[in-house]
Amino acid sequence: MSKKFTMTLLSSSLAGLLVMSGGVSAQEEKYTVPYAIGEGKWGNTYEVVKTGGNGNFRYEVKEKNGKKRSLFTFDSKGDVIINGSGITYTIHDGALNDFAQTAEKKKNGQSQSHRMTDSVVRDVYNKVYSLQRTKITGFSVEDGENGKVSLGSDAKASGEFSVAVGNGAKATEKASTSVGSWSAALGRQSVALGVGTYAYANASTAAGTAAYVDGSAIYGTAIGNYAKVDKNATEGVALGAKAISAHKNSVALGANSRTTRDNEVYIGYEEASGKAYKTRTLGGLTDGTRPSDAATVRQVDRVKDSVEQLAQDTNTRLVVEAKKSREYTDSRTTVGVNPDGKLTRAEGATKTIAVNDGLVALSGRTDRIDYAVGSVDRRVTKNTQAIQSNTRQLQEHNARLNSQQRQIRENHEEMKRAAAQSAALAGLFQPYSVGKFNATAALGGYSDKQAVAVGVGYRFNEQTAAKAGIAASDGDVSYNMGVNFEF
């Protein structure tokens, strides 16, 4: 509302001076409210009477007709407190505050101007009249520089620009938002959404029934029923029912998942307390191109084929070399020996043999060939066993990667359903008419998935509205709730 009014005294060019009502002494402190428009015209419609005592003064605005009907009262800060139909509402108006301060200065003999006119009175009265007839139990709004909004039995919004919606909901720090019965947003800029949800840390977010972010887990995010970001898990993320992020900068992805170390994304889950963690399949991956990228089954299969071919080539070469070694042992050299054991001839031999008392000496020690061949056979056997072990390991990796591909495909389908639900929720309309509920439905889609959403809303006044919606797609359900403030 515009506060730029031109006010003139009956016979003066001074703007907005306080004027006593005709026939009333200054000690009674009754003041006439001027017209907002018109030169040299002072209104006969409204008057302001100062009431109260012992330092607790208030100003009562009345009609100046025979009925003297009281319209509203305001204090020295320009605040109008309304109590009616289960509502507590505070309206702050700068012109009312200006009038109260001017009246105090005039009482002390100072000539001062003010900004309250008949149009200001009518505007404030219209707000009061409308709010007195609004029937919402447990609704409280503080309208002013540090506006706070609470809606629901025992709901409390005590921080600057805070919002608490739901029975027992609490938003205690600056810019905190708590939506849901018994929810609590106790950190600066924290958000708690859901029944029994707690966001204790600064800049934390908790969404889902009994979702929880510890007070030491700054920037923590817990989404899902009973999801939790535990003590000192700064920047931790728990996504999924009963998921727990217990380490710094770590992500627990999926129902019952729990992180095991800092800087980790963990998708395994605990089927029962105290038992070993089970695994999930991560599917839909492209082939890795960087050292930090995950490898796909396709890439591992190529490595497996290369290893198997290498093993086959190595085995062939070892068999050939072994056969060559055995052929040397089959060669013969005919020799002649005298009775004294001396060699007489050795046909085609490059080595010589001496026989003495049944002992044979072969120069060059070619008698070690058979031993060398046996050693080669043992090495070939060990290599074959190692290759078989590597083949089994590759088969196990292949099975795990196949499982990951299936999981990625399932995640992709779930993401498309979530996108369709988001599109449907975005199509729900916000209420526009003050004091009226609205019901709306919308259809959304993404790729080959569709979702339907329904929602309701209510506009409390021109500045405040709330709405909630729910969307469903192939058995999956998502929801949202929101409160809108206009300043």
Swiss-Prot record:
Extra remark: Encoded in a prophage region of strain ECOR 9, upon UV treatment bacteriophage containing this gene can be isolated.
Residue ranges, annotated region (Left-handed coiled-coil (LHcc)): 359-417
Domain of life of the organism encoding this protein: Bacteria
CDD domains per record: LbR_YadA-like
Signal peptide coordinates: 1-26
Region (Head domain): 154-278
Positions of the UniProt region annotated as Saddle domain: 333-358
Region described as Outer membrane translocation of the passenger domain: 394-436
Region (Right-handed coiled-coil (RHcc)): 295-332
Topology feature Extracellular, residues: 27-436
Transmembrane spans: 437-447, 450-461, 464-473, 477-487
Protein name: Immunoglobulin-binding protein EibE
Protein location: Cell surface; Cell outer membrane
Gene: eibE
Positions in coiled-coil regions: 379-422
A Pfam family recorded for this sequence: YadA_head
Function per UniProt: Binds (in a non-immune fashion) to the Fc portion of human IgG and very weakly to IgA; binding occurs on the cell surface. Confers the ability to survive exposure to human serum exposure.
Organism per entry: Escherichia coli
Induction remarks: In strain ECOR 9 expression is greater at 37 than 27 degrees Celsius and increases upon entry into stationary phase (at protein level). Upon expression from a plasmid in strain AB1157 (with its own leader sequence) more protein is seen at 37 than 27 degrees Celsius (at protein level).
Neck, as annotated region: 279-294
Any one GO cellular component localisation term in the record: cell surface
Family from the record: Belongs to the autotransporter-2 (AT-2) (TC 1.B.40) family. Eib subfamily.
